[in-house]
Amino acid sequence: MDLLKECREELEYAVSVRRYLHENPEPAAHELQTVRFIVSELEKFGIEYLNIPDGGVLGFVRGALPGKTVMLRADCDALKMTEAPDNGKAPKVCVSKVPGLAHACGHDTHTAMLLTAGKVLAKNRDSLKGTVILMFERGEEGGGNIYYLLKYMREHQITADACFAQHNDPLLPVGQIAVSPGPRFAGSFGFHIRLTGVGGHGSRPDRGNNPIDCFLAIAAQFKDLRMRMIPPDVLFTASINMVNAGSAHNITPETLTFAGTVRTYDFQKGIRFREKFREIIEKNCEIFECGCEFLRWKGPTIPVINQNEATRFARAMSESVLGAENVSDNIPDLCGESFGVTTAFFPCVLAAVGSGNAAEGRTAPLHSPYYDPDEDSLLYGSAYYAACAYGFTDADLTFNFEPFQEELEALYKLTNRPIPKRLDP
């Protein structure tokens, strides 16, 4: 079957879906209108589904022939930011109609691609083997809603033999896919700390206790810790990106707050770094006689590491759709991705689908107000999804993978993250 041709015939549909979602964005954990739209589209295609409260939607395309189960994943939430009406070179074809919200990470394109792939798969279910699960994940941008999706799946014995995902990449030209084994997105650890000293007049530091002194010691040792603990060939970044203290040149401040992030592909090194950094903070507070409050202390999250065998398969499927000359290795990205939680339970791959077009000014990065993906990427992303589904269910493949054996709550405890609150009415 020529899946690229099949998806090309549905490109107009994919574009219409993307534009509707783009104009009507909803933030993480609040995607009720988006979910209603997804469900209505699945109903049109005759695809059975489960709308899981606070989690997302699972669609089930059941083939006419027996076979394995494969899962395709997309996210659907937007960012709390204001979108520019142009991409820096030309006006955009559509812009958010909701003040302060924008699909600046392309989750609208991901949902459009997966719905289009689902439509193609459902139309050809007579030749499809096994079952294809369409996972529409809510709350990727910090909402944590994947917890409720996976919890439901585990409680109801819904499983898959592999899971394939993708993320649009405006730095990769449209018509190209990048996918390779190993590191894809990093695990992240975020911190926000308040130090409390004693305020006073700047002329008499002996009568106060300046928390800036304590912070300077912590910051220096924070940098040293990265040098001492992490080999130079390991992708690992640690940065303090916010410091707030003081109100005048001659007033010793009473408090100081600082915040930052750590990114790593090595989960265990991330945990070890977190533990040692906490020791540094607490011991310096003791030395400088400052109070300390951990306002945020979360992570590290699970990094996205593409499973070797599944990635080789996904690359072969990408080449079958676009040709080997248009498929390359992905560059590891130290951004975080909630898909890491899913990778703990299934052999997974997350590919990059090019959405950039320099000639049209469509090269602004993700999370930029000027972000403006080339809509032709919808064709290649949906074809990638469909090819992975058809190819996997038709092949005799078993991936060497050991899932996380404990309960989902144990994984969240390990990552030092709370169970997300339920918000659905």
Regions found by a protein language model. Give the residues of each.
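Acidic/His- and Gly-rich active-site-bordering loop/insert found
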Residues: 1-103, 108, 112-129
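Divalent metal-coordination and catalytic microenvironments
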Residues: 21, 59, 72, 107, ...
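Active-site beta-loop-alpha junctions enriched in small/polar residues
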Residues: 26, 75-77, 139, 169, ...
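Buried hydrophobic packing segments
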Residues: 38, 113-121, 149, 215-218, ...
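Non-cysteine beta-strand/loop elements that form the S-adenosyl-L-methionine
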Residues: 71-73, 82, 191, 350-355
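Histidine/acidic-residue-rich, glycine-tolerant segments that coordinate divalent metal ions
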Residues: 79-81, 92-102, 108-109, 121-242, ...
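Metal-dependent amide/peptide-bond hydrolase catalytic core
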Residues: 216-425
